Amino acid sequence: MRLPSHHLELLSPARDAAIAREAILHGADAVYIGGPGFGARHNASNSLRDIADLVPFAHRFGAKVFVTLNTILHDDELEPAQRLITDLYQTGVDALIVQDMGVLEMDIPPIELHASTQCDIRSVEKAKFLSDAGFTQIVLARELNLNQIRDIRQATDATIEFFIHGALCVAYSGQCNISHAQTGRSANRGDCSQACRLPYTLKDDQGRVVAFDKHLLSMKDNDQTANLGALIDAGVQSFKIEGRYKDMSYVKNITAHYRQMLDAIIEDRGGLARSSAGRTEHFFIPSTDKTFHRGSTDYFVNARKDDIGAFDSPKFIGLPVGEVLKVTKEYLDVEVTEPLANGDGLNVMIKREVVGFRANTVEKTGENRYRVWPNEMPADMYKARPNAALNRNLDHNWQQALMKTSSERRIAVDIELGGWEEQLILTMTCEDGISVTHTLDGMFEVANNAEKALNSLKDGVAKLGQTIYYARDIQVNLADALFIPNSLLNQFRRETAEMLDEARLANYPRGSRKAVSVPPPVYPETHLSFLANVYNHKARAFYQRYGVELIDAAYEAHEEKGDVPVMITKHCLRFAFNLCPKQAKGSIKSWKATPMQLVNGDEVLTLKFDCRPCEMHVIGKMKNHILKMPQPGSIVASVSPDDLLKTLPKRKGS
């Protein structure tokens, strides 16, 4: 079900169901979570029971639950994946986020489908095709700018989803095979080895060192706080936070931050609304600086910049809080700009490495000065230079606040109590129009003190503290002020609120699979390389049905034995180090974009530059021992050698 054009959806990640609940309570309009398998996050799976329990919790708030099934599938996995989709549909989830087009060829229930970021949606033509082929919502590539997003929005009727916060893959999503090439762990199957976070030395075509031992493929984290209004204007409706590996504190904090930002825009502009019900009150001040990040960038949304990389370290350094004055074997003396607390996480940068520790005890020794005893003194701390900058990447007191109840989300209800001496009628109507009416029969006496009785009735029906509701308006319309025992009134109110819970679930509008356009779409290319990630016969049939004539197998099929682009990126190291021909004065021909090399130990990667689309291709080769491994996802790869031997027929006489 496509979002209404004026609705904005804040979409939060959830490693597990507990985090999903907190994301919703902190303001998420939808959450995305991994199921028992095929979820593109190797260590972030959840049982069907956990998801089934999550769904009604979300739906009472009008919030949605999306399940990721966005790995590419081996032929041996098609049947179990199809069974899982059927099971997920029965739990009531709202949509599947998928990468593998083979899913669209399966015999599955009419569940809504969203095109994953792994589909690498960068062009109008591809976006329109996916929309016409049956996808209700599409996740655009993080590398797009506002004009490109706007063009896609105008060309398609799918809901546009865009990442607004979190870790950035340096490669186009779905176009990175370096992990599989080097380790056999496929990013397209949720098991990335994070080669992009390693240190590399950059050399030019003459072998000269341009940068030594830097994290040259490690990006800063995405932060679109300043661009939310512009993204809305460009047509984005679903604002996605990255982070299905992130912990509870991270999800609470970042969800709360963007809930407040979007609510401010909705209130300021008018004509916009959040896509779920309720108001959220936070009991802490959100700060994107206080949970994990590698520095912030808005990437390419406005224009290409040369400071998008986190070259010094892929770790979370945190905020500067002072400087180190003295280091001994047991403690540090520091001067700070903010108070410290026991349990704080502190660090300094020593020779390009982050050296950190937890503060076991801090003692104030003077104005803005502390003595800090670490839990364990890092071995290299004595190397800290005089007045080295001190950073805090874990604010213990702030984290403690997040460990407690840190938000409350309630739905506004209008309450009307009417009736007469023989019957009371209680009506509760939610802010989104869902309404229930409950009656209570009896012989109720007229109260001696009318004013006191009316006030008591108003207070009684307004006590919604143990529910997800709050009373926005209360009307008591009785011919006479009646005396109702508190116990009876409380039970009457509780039963009505429970009826409202049930009505919200009963009236929840479930989406369905979008129909293929008439006439059916034609895929914009007739030849697909291994970069299309076609890994099974159903995906191949899908593309053939829509006009593709030549289809290469996915990289995981081990058919690409030579040098190929194992990573394609919008990030360009020539640009980052002012070696781009387009930066050179005069003609573009005056400075050629010759290949360069990235070196990490024995691993040597070639960089080639495609200047027309401003892309960098990282060229590498699959290691021989990986070529000999079973294809990921195949039964052979999933079964131990001993168990595999048990499946072989026994010889006669043995």
Language model region names:
Residues 122-126:
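Short, glycine/polar-rich helix-capping loops at beta-to-alpha or helix-loop-helix junctions
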Residues 102-109:
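Short active-site loop/helix that positions an aromatic residue
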